Amino acid sequence: RLFDQFFGEGMFDHDLLPFTSPTISPFYRQSLFRNFLDSSNSGISEVRSDRDKFTVHWDVKHFSPDELSVKVIDDFVEIQGKHGERQDDHGYISREFHRRYRLPSTVDQSAITCSLSADGLLTLSGPNPAGGPNGRSDRSIPVCR
């Protein structure tokens, strides 16, 4: 899992007012695990590559399928998301991200699929056939709901 991918989540109180007083024990200051705890339910991607298939999951709950672009270019898969300014609970916000991951050489790029669940989880998967490396080409992958 990659824990540094927040796709437009709000700020937390401790992001704005960290403990800065020198009289406070260091044990009560920002925890090393704070980012892990805060990210447990937002903006995380998970990459898995096992013997049968390669899978990537992204939390893109703030984007609709037409605001997402998924492409395979050479040995990489690229995902981009962008939406214009819209109103939320705290005012107006626009979001944009771009991620790029290297595909294992055994993934059959022509069989890669991508789907978006109702709760905003984007899943890309491709089989790892036993035949070894496959031909490489550039192509766009449609995001299906």
From Swiss-Prot:
Location of region: Disordered: 124-145
Sites where the protein binds Zn(2+) 2: H90
**Quick one: where is this thing mainly located?**
cytoplasm
Phylogenetic placement of the source organism: Eukaryota, Metazoa, Chordata, Craniata, Vertebrata
UniProt subcellular location: Cytoplasm; Nucleus
The record's Gene Ontology biological-process terms are:
lens development in camera-type eye; negative regulation of apoptotic process; protein refolding; response to heat
Q: Which Gene3D superfamilies does the entry mention? A: 2.60.40.790
Q: Name one GO cellular component term.
A: cytoplasm
Task: State the organism named in the record.
Answer: Oryzias latipes
Q: Which GO terms describe its molecular function?
A: metal ion binding; structural constituent of eye lens; unfolded protein binding
- Give the residues the record marks as binding Zn(2+) 1: H83, E85
Q: InterPro entries, from UniProt? A: A-crystallin/Hsp20_dom, Alpha-crystallin/HSP_16, Alpha-crystallin/sHSP_animal, Alpha-crystallin_N, HSP20-like_chaperone
Could you tell me what this protein is called? Answer: Alpha-crystallin A chain
Question: Could you say which protein family the record assigns here?
Answer: Belongs to the small heat shock protein (HSP20) family.
Describe the function of this protein: Contributes to the transparency and refractive index of the lens. May act as a chaperone, preventing aggregation of various proteins under a wide range of stress conditions.
PANTHER family the UniProt entry points to = ALPHA-CRYSTALLIN A CHAIN, HEAT SHOCK PROTEIN HSP-12.2-RELATED
Q: How does it assemble?
A: Heteropolymer composed of three CRYAA and one CRYAB subunits. Inter-subunit bridging via zinc ions enhances stability, which is crucial as there is no protein turn over in the lens. Zinc coordination is achieved at least by His-83, Glu-85 and His-90. His-83 and Glu-85 come from the same molecule within the oligomer, while His-90 residue is provided by another molecule. Can also form homodimers and homotetramers (dimers of dimers) which serve as the building blocks of homooligomers. Part of a complex required for lens intermediate filament formation composed of BFSP1, BFSP2 and CRYAA.
Provide the sHSP domain boundaries.
Answer: 35-144
